[in-house]
């Protein structure tokens, strides 16, 4: 699993649940800008990864299981 795959999984997960990334963040109790592409790397270009707490909030808000979410990573494992 790489940085791109996990963020792409969040993008797809939001879309498949009928939301934008901003909508998913809000529904999860997060700042609406949490999943903005501009926040996926630091100002120095270092990748920022979503925390396990963030993933947990996504799952709770959508009533999804970890397997439901990680399927999106499995489905895009050839992406780099």
Identify the function of each model-found stretch.
Residues 1-23:
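A short, Lys/Arg-rich alpha-helix, primarily the initiator
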Residues 11, 22, 26, 56, ...:
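Residues within the helices of the helix-turn-helix
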Residues 14, 39, 73:
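DNA major-groove recognition helix of helix-turn-helix
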Residues 15, 26, 60:
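Alpha-helical residues within the helix-turn-helix
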Residues 20, 31-34, 51, 65:
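Short coil turns linking two alpha-helices in DNA-binding domains
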Residues 29-48:
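Recognition helix of helix-turn-helix/homeodomain-like DNA-binding domains
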Residues 43-60:
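Short, basic-rich loop-to-helix N-cap that marks the start of a DNA-contacting helix
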Residues 60, 67-80:
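Short, charged recognition helix plus adjacent turn
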